[in-house]
Amino acid sequence: MAQGQSLQDIFLNVLRRERIQVSIYLFNGIKLQGHIESFDQFVIVLKNTISQMVYKHAVSTIVPSKFVSHYANNSSNYSNHSGDRN
């Protein structure tokens, strides 16, 4: 994955661009909800009624409110990494 964008960046960018509501679960069990306003290598800015800067090292899971096809516009960057070992 050295070439182009990382899978993480592609996924977060789709969520940001399409303003998809997300639930972000932190390692300490806290659940944050909103849409991703921006992100960089270290943080995600989540907006709901307020903006919150969340450090990525504290994030356990990001759950979109609807299906996200993060390969749709980036199929040339990645082969199928679905875990199939055929």
Swiss-Prot record:
GO cellular component, one term: cytosol
Any single GO BP term: regulation of DNA-templated transcription
Source taxon at top rank: Bacteria
GO function terms (MF aspect): RNA binding
Keywords of this entry: RNA-binding, Stress response
Pfam families assigned: Hfq (PF17209)
PROSITE patterns: SM
Domain Sm positions: 9-68
Classification via InterPro entries: Hfq (IPR005001), LSM_dom_sf (IPR010920), Sm (IPR047575)
Sequence similarity: Belongs to the Hfq family.
Subunit text: Homohexamer.
Function text: RNA chaperone that binds small regulatory RNA (sRNAs) and mRNAs to facilitate mRNA translational regulation in response to envelope stress, environmental stress and changes in metabolite concentrations. Also binds with high specificity to tRNAs.
HAMAP family: Hfq
Protein name: RNA-binding protein Hfq
